């Protein structure tokens, strides 16, 4: 009788534990930054994975140092109010938007430009507009001039110009700072709408398999945020890379394997 009682107690504890774990997963999947991480670099890698330095170690560390808003922060529209589909957001980045035109491609250019500006590489801040003309920044260390440059850039650049300007990268060679981008329109009229997301961190296991974090903005303009991976059973933000995949579903957006780009 005592043995049966012990078994029942053990089973009851297991059920309670499983229910608690399930509740933790459910709550975590609906709450932004559930563990209150301070920066992107604080987000733990998947088990068995280690962060890579990347070809530009300073750029990798800059992206990992980007601050996150606290637990439960909503993705807010630039014009005010909560954006739709909050569950797509894993953590909100603590970077105020500069204008209502700062959308997906603009966010990718913004993060790249912020790195160059904050490290004093002013002469390397240059992007092309939709007509292929290079727009170079020449305001030096002036934050006001830098932000004015970006606001002007947002009005004349897009996923189309970004995809043409950046160079292709093989998935197996993915680096922090790379961008998945498909253009809103190309010469053949493909894609009514475009989208771009930035790889803000990359980790690798001993077998060379990569995992990565993505950040995005969207239309209408909203807070930059780390994306949640709904295919991950733990609702983790880490995406896993299949080098042989022809099509990648990143959150709700599909990308072809040849749509990974780098600056």
Q: Language-model segments: which ranges?
A:
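...with weaker cross-activation on analogous glycine-rich loops/strands in unrelated enzymes
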Residues: 144-210
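Extracellular-facing segments of soluble proteins and assemblies that are Gly/Ser/Thr-biased and enriched
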Residues: 94-173
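N-terminal hydrophobic targeting/anchoring segments and the immediately downstream early-domain regions
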Residues: 86-90
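Low-complexity, Gly/Ser/Thr/Pro-rich intrinsically disordered linker/tail segments
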Residues: 211-263
């Amino acid at each position: 009788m005592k043995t049966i009682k012990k078994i029942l107690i053990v089973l009851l504890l297991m059920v309670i534990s499983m229910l608690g774990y399930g509740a933790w997963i459910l709550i975590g999947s609906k709450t932004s930054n559930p563990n209150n991480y301070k920066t992107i670099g604080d987000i733990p890698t998947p088990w068995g994975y280690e962060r890579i330095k990347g070809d530009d170690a300073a750029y990798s560390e800059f992206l990992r140092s980007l601050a996150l808003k606290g637990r439960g922060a909503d993705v807010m529209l630039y014009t005010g109010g909560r954006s739709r589909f909050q569950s797509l957001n894993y953590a909100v980045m603590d970077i105020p938007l500069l204008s209502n035109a700062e959308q997906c491609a603009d966010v990718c250019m913004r993060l790249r430009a912020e790195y160059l500006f904050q490290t004093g590489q002013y002469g390397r801040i240059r992007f092309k507009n939709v007509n292929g003309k290079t727009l170079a920044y020449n305001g030096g260390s002036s934050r006001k001039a830098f932000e004015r440059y970006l606001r002007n850039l947002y009005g004349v650049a897009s996923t189309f110009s970004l995809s043409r300007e950046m160079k292709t990268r093989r998935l197996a060679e993915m680096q922090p700072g790379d961008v998945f981008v498909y253009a809103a329109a190309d010469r053949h009229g493909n894609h009514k709408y475009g989208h771009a997301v930035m790889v803000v961190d990359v980790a690798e296991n001993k077998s060379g398999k990569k995992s990565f974090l993505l950040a995005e903005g969207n239309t209408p303009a909203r807070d930059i945020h780390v994306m949640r991976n709904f295919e991950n059973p733990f609702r983790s933000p880490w995406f896993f890379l299949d080098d042989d995949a022809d099509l990648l579903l990143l959150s709700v957006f599909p990308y072809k394997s040849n749509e990974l780009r780098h600056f």
